[in-house]
Design a protein with these regions (language model features):
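Loop-to-transmembrane helix entry/capping segments in MFS-fold secondary transporters
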Residues: 44-45, 148-158, 300, 383-395
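C-terminal ends and interior cores of transmembrane alpha-helices
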Residues: 84-113, 340-352
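C-terminal transmembrane helical hairpin of 12-TM major facilitator-type secondary transporters
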Residues: 325-375
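Intracellular loop-helix junctions on the cytosolic face of multi-pass helical membrane proteins
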Residues: 1-10, 106-107, 111-123, 133-134, ...
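Helix-to-loop junctions at the C-terminal end of transmembrane segments
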Residues: 60-76, 316-329, 414
Length: 448
């Protein structure tokens, strides 16, 4: 074991393959949650509030996964036990969530939401919690086992597999509709095309996580210490650092990359929340009221297609990211990608043809590709190895917090700034990405 050893491409691939299945689950959630809750009876101005729970749970869970997996050393591995636990919970919830409308929970309960919505909310909370438990270890294992020279490649592979999983998850509903599974249902009931998408996604998630679990051998404590140039437990007993102490000692890149993350993830929260309504009104002449209408549910399928094209664009952009990083370095590649994504968001305002709209979402994919790879490359290169998992867990707050803020203020922005126009929220997302690109100049790379 040498500090500068390289992993083969196959080893790097195995490290992240389970991410393919996890991302299918995440894609199904991202593309269908607004559709599901609108079908259950949510008002468009309420939709963003349903998106508070996923990032909130992520902000709580991922730092805990990072902290405790840093201290987990057993025969199953260090990070891998969390993969299995997260995947098992996610599979169970994916079988329940799309059936929320089948339990005839019609009565209005707390905050004016019917019982089906509350059932869906709690299912969503557990789904996102479990996805977070399963997702975070993949990023940590790259930080644990890959040297600085290969991290860019490792996270690019992860980004590619992530987007491939997204592509599969996004097209499931329209694919099942094409083969004859019903895409409409009685009012308040989720269509079968969506239900079967979640069922198949759950099966693939479990298989992919099992593949990584079986094929990856994590470093033992002695190997890990040698790889990262740390003292072993035999050499030194270190006090477990507190949350506050870790934040105080965080490298400046933690905060500057986090600022860029704030604008980026707020933008994508708006995309996930409002794409269904925006596309339905912009391209399918939806009346803005009847969510059981064919126009709304057809638009719901097309959202999946748009997100799939975004994933394809992201995969293609991920392939050229190493070249961009070579000529413009990490920061330049990051900023360029965000600007391309911003143009994609803003262009949706002028598009009324559903097929032309695909070009806009392909451009948006450039920003997504950069968001999945560059921040983690910059951050992990600035960290020492002893609290890598905890810092990556804390860094997840820069993903979750902006989504929470965007979810809380999204309804007000829709009402008072965008005058009820959901397509206006996509333009707002483009403006946020431009602010993110400008903020890239504040990042200083390298270890503290």
């Amino acid at each position: 074991m040498t500090e500068k050893r390289n992993l083969s491409f196959g080893q790097l691939f195995n490290l992240s393959f389970g991410f393919f299945g996890v991302q299918i689950a995440y894609a199904l959630q991202s593309a269908n949650i607004s559709r599901i809750f609108a079908t259950l009876g949510a008002d468009p101005h309420q939709l963003s509030f349903f998106w508070v729970l996923p990032p909130l749970m992520g902000m709580i869970v991922q730092p805990l996964v990072g902290k405790y997996s840093d201290k987990t050393w057993n025969r199953l591995g260090r990070r891998k036990p969390y993969l299995i636990v997260g995947a098992l919970i996610a599979v169970a919830v994916m079988l329940l969530l799309p059936n929320a409308g089948n339990f005839t929970f019609g009565q209005s309960l707390f905050l004016g939401l019917n019982a089906a919505m509350w059932f869906g909310l709690f299912s969503l909370m557990f789904l996102d919690t479990s996805i977070n438990i399963a997702m975070q270890p993949f990023k940590m294992m790259v930080g644990d086992m890959v040297n600085e020279e290969q991290k860019g490649l490792a996270y690019s592979i992860q980004s590619f597999l992530c987007n491939a999983g997204s592509l599969a998850g996004y097209i499931f509903p329209i694919l099942f509709t094409w083969v004859g599974i019903a895409n409409t249902a009685p009012e308040g009931v989720i269509p079968d095309s969506v239900k079967w998408s979640f069922y198949i996604g759950a099966a693939i998630l479990m298989l992919c996580v099992l593949y990584t679990f079986v094929t990856v051998k994590e470093l033992n404590p002695e190997e890990y210490a040698k790889f990262h140039g740390l003292a072993t437990k035999k050499d030194e007993k270190k006090e477990d650092p507190s949350f506050i102490k870790l934040l105080i000692n965080a490298p400046s890149t933690f905060w500057t990359v986090g600022l860029v993350q704030f604008f980026c993830w707020a933008a994508f929260l708006f995309m996930w929340t409002y794409s269904n309504g925006a596309i339905a009104t912009q391209c399918f002449s939806w009346d803005g009221v009847n969510t059981a209408a064919e126009a709304f549910q057809t638009a719901g399928n097309w959202v999946g297609v748009c997100f799939a094209i975004q994933a394809v664009g992201s995969m293609l952009w991920a392939l050229i990211m190493p070249t961009l990083e070579k000529y413009f370095h990490n920061k330049g590649a990051y900023a360029i990608s965000l600007i391309v994504g911003a143009l994609g968001f803003i262009s949706t305002l002028f598009v009324t043809n559903q097929y032309v709209l695909l070009v806009s979402y392909a451009f948006i994919g450039a920003a997504w590709a950069a968001m999945l790879a560059v921040p983690f490359t910059i951050l992990t290169n600035s960290l020492k190895g002893d609290n890598m998992g905890y810092y990556l867990g804390l860094f997840n707050c820069t993903i979750c917090l902006p989504q929470i803020v965007a979810a809380l203020i999204g309804g007000a922005i829709l009402k008072y700034i965008c005058a009820g126009s959901q397509i206006g929220m996509l333009v707002a997302a483009g403006v946020l990405l431009i602010l993110g690109a400008i903020s890239v100049v504040l990042i200083k790379e390298g270890k503290k």
